Amino acid sequence: MYHDFESHTITRRSFLKGAGAVGAAGLLAACGGSSSSTAASASSASSGAAASGKGLSELFTYETSGREIESWNILYSQQAIDFNVTTNIIDGLISFDNYGKPVPALAKSWEHNEDSTVWTFHLRDDVDWVDMNGEVQDHLTSKDFLVGFEWVLNAKKNQASNTSMPSTTVVGAADYYDKTYAMDDAAAAALTYDDMLAAGVGIDAPDDYTVVFTCLNPCPYFDTVASYVCCYPAPPALVEKLGVEGFRGVDYTQQWCCGPYLIEEFVSDNSKRFIPNPHYYAADECSRFERVSLSMITDLTVGYQLYQNRELDELELSESTLTTITSDTSNAYNDQLCEKRPTKYAYDFHFNFHCLNTDGTPNENWNKAVANRAFRRCFQEGLNLIPYYARFNKINPLKCENNYYTMKGVCYNSKGTDYVDLVAKELGIDGEKYDGKTMVHLRKSTADSIAALKKQAMDELTAIGATFPVKAPFFFVAGNTVQQDNATVLKQCFTDSFGDDFIQLDLGTYVSSLAKEVRIPKLHGFVINGWGADFGDPVNFVGQEILHDSNAYYAVNYSNIQLVAEDPADYQKELVDEFEQFTDLVNAANAIVDDTDARYEAFAKAEAYMINNSLAVPCYYDVRWCLTHVNEYTKINAMFGPCNLKYVNWETSEDAYTTAQYEEFAKAFDAAKS
């Protein structure tokens, strides 16, 4: 095991080997400790003055319970909780800088032909795969991208994960997926990249360090597709060694790495330790920490205790902690409160139209209610979420308001207009601006209009046998007091908005995995999930909700609308028809390949249709306050791809950054970006 870098005297690391994160918090409250004073990253010209001349050589950070990594296979996963880890051990063709601009990674350069149908990537020739001990196992060449691409497109290997992006952009990709889907498991598993090439899939490796993709249609955004994990490499020797089942379920002890870090230690639901990859190809081109120590904490309240004792170097603040600080003028952290940039995720209410009880029987009352358009529109037109937003941003809660399904900044038309502004126009809210007082969608609603919509829903549902109040199953991770408080506040929002005779949240808990304990058993009435772009086109958002596509992530995994559409009850037929119309609008927009402006206009109409029919309901943006020794404005900040939590080129300070410094960072960043 690679141990060039030693930790200092007493750290969380020694405690967490023998104790859980909760117990460790109590131990650490008595022992303090601090991070190394050696600078880990240089000052950035765009970020303003640093808090001190000393940076951190070792970073102490965290993740909250219920967000443990579930898959170490970066080709297979579609979850941020996995990418936040695996992006640090495996690189792709392209990465991004702190302004979200694409920068070289495994590809040193790339170009496309005149109509953007052929994209050529020129690979570095100095990249090696290493094992968990930092020992070189193989050299990376273009063949690794052929192996990786065949894996992704093979339905029996990658099980439809991350297939939608190449299927809609690369010649022959969808046909190859369909071919493997129709084969038996053993026959599909035996296929290799040679079979993929023979089938006419539009990827080629003319030499050891060149990869060429041929697109179905002009695709000016294909570099953003290529930045995503669907185009990542896979080491042929490792795939052969582990076999299909073994590689799909690969763990960190088996994984080969080509990224900036290795996993020194992993204790599930407890801790992770990253150390530098000794053979990292870009070691002299970026700054890295000598160690990153990540602990799983039960909630942000525990995190605050750790931060106070310098056992964490950055911490997002819960509403209660922010209140504690701001209500005491003598609190030492008052001048260190830093407002972060929005994350790249747009959070939405995702309904489950095929909800089950714990015994596997249908939750008929919820299923009837959520199939009703007026019922869903109450979420859209009558729900005041400001108290819920305050859970994330107590000082400026309405900065969290989200009115769109697609995240801002994903793509722009030829006039430089953000795509979501086109959606706003279709929704009739393009003239509405942030005022810090009222939610946009409540400005046109009145008490009478909300009451009328509620009555309509109750009358229509009573007529088909639904009973009130409708119980909406909503889950949070057990033992996480912040999530529990969030859920409690959300429940009160429904009460305050509609009374208790209409909708009531039925709060439940899961132990560690939302997917295994809630989503797969279909117990949820709705979830609030965020989606970040995999590439820079609206189809990557709205395409997740359509019918007749096994790659539509939310339609398959959360809303279960595809199951409903197979045999809808009478009360679900109108809902299915709405999804059919939405699907037609999305497919029509996606068929426009020769006029980007027209394409975006068509997608805006499709998205507006989805929102107006509340097939999913926009909820919030994640805009938090934090205490930190890390300059957020030096982190990767891309609207697409998995790279944002890669621990490279971070500017840090031994002293905590102040509110004033962060305001200067923001000004300098915006000035340099414009």
Please report, for each region that a protein language model flagged, where it lies by residue.
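N-terminal secretory signal peptides
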Residues: M1-I10, G18-A30
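Alpha-helical secondary-structure segments
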Residues: T141-V147, D208-T214, P260, F289-R291, ...
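N-terminal lobe/hinge region of extracytoplasmic solute-binding protein
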Residues: Y62-E114, W256-C257
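Ligand/substrate-recognition segments at binding pockets and active sites
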Residues: S268, N396-P397, G431-A533, E578, ...
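Gly/Pro-rich hinge or "lid" segments in bacterial periplasmic/extracellular proteins
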Residues: N98, A186-A190, L197-G200, D207-Y209, ...
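Aromatic- and charge-enriched surface segment that lines or borders ligand/interaction sites
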Residues: K108-A173, V212, G303-L306, N365-A371, ...
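Ligand-site clamp/hinge motif
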Residues: V244-Y252, H279-D328
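Detector for C-terminal structural segments
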Residues: A21, L28, C378-A424, A478, ...
